[in-house]
Amino acid sequence: MKIIFSVLNTGLGNNGGSKTIIESANTLVNLNHDVYILDSGKSMYTWGPIKAQHIKLKTKRDIPDADVIVSTGFKSVRATVRLPKRCGVQFTYMRGWELWKMSQQQIINEVLKAPTIKIVNSIGLQQKLKSLGFESYIIRPGNDFNSIYPMISRTQNVVLGGLYHTKHKTKRHSWIIHTAKALKSKYTNIQLWMFGSDSDPNIPVIDKYLYQPNKIKKASFYNGITVWLAPSELEGLHIPPQEAMLAECVVVTTDAPLSGTSDYISHEKTGLVAKNDIFSFVAQVERLIRDPLLRSKISKNGRKMIIDLGSRETNMQKMVKLFEEFI
């Protein structure tokens, strides 16, 4: 099958959204499909190889004929739907609710009302679209099971972990900082480790910080963490908590409708779900500090849950089957 991923007007850079698209494209190449990434400019992505053919669009003649073309960002939809029919059946792959790029009404008008078939990456996003009167299909990106797995036995010391991200306040990294401060004031065996795309913030409460770690460093990092804090409130399918769970970290999240964790976190089974306020969040983290048996039970269940969601290969095969239904 010939597949085009359109990143027109959005581009590729060192961020989670670009990484997901590139890993999906690479997986489809490995599955013997012809895959292209259609871009408005030069790729700024340096986190790994791009196996798909990257095309910098100059004229429409640069675009190959294809079976399907997939818009991958809110701002790529308008440009993509104007492309020739020979580019294939048009899909939109929604992987977040990007209110930092558009208002909700703009999303409805420019993305949801566009004449494309909608794919989402999570239950939360599917429910959001349904509440607005739009149908969609769930295709998750999957995970790399060979990259992150349990390596060590954890000690009684508790290491809290989280994503440090200041660009979008909806990531709520401030909740992680607040939680660590509150619990460090009560317990002596607590540390906080964080990673992110920001340079080291040099905040005293953070005991260890990794800047843009590669897969090997990230795997080791997750294995040193006991409890992963995931307070984000505006996600599609939140990836770092899944990676942490593969290393048998226990995740604490919230019941925010777009937490991005409802696909894989079931309260007290595969993680802990706090109410969507910071006091409840701190209380759930403290439960895990005080109860190592609960941590042990949930950590095993959590890893199994992420494995059950499937590998990248399994999920991209599902995507291809969906494409085949519309060709």
Language-model segments: what does each one mean?
Residues T59-I63, W97-I119, L125-Q127:
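Membrane-proximal helix-turn-helix segments that form the acceptor-binding/catalytic region
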Residues K101-Q104, K130-S131, E135-N157:
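Acidic anion/phosphate-binding donor-loop and adjacent secondary structure
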Residues A219, P241-L246, S262-D263:
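Short alpha-helical segment that forms part of, or immediately flanks, the ligand-binding pocket
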Residues V250-D255:
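Short hydrophobic beta-strand element within catalytic cores of glycosyltransferases
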Residues H267-I278, R287-P292:
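Conserved acidic donor-binding segment of nucleotide-sugar-dependent glycosyltransferases
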Residues S280, R287, L294-L309, N315-K321:
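A short, well-ordered alpha-helix in the C-terminal region of glycosyltransferases
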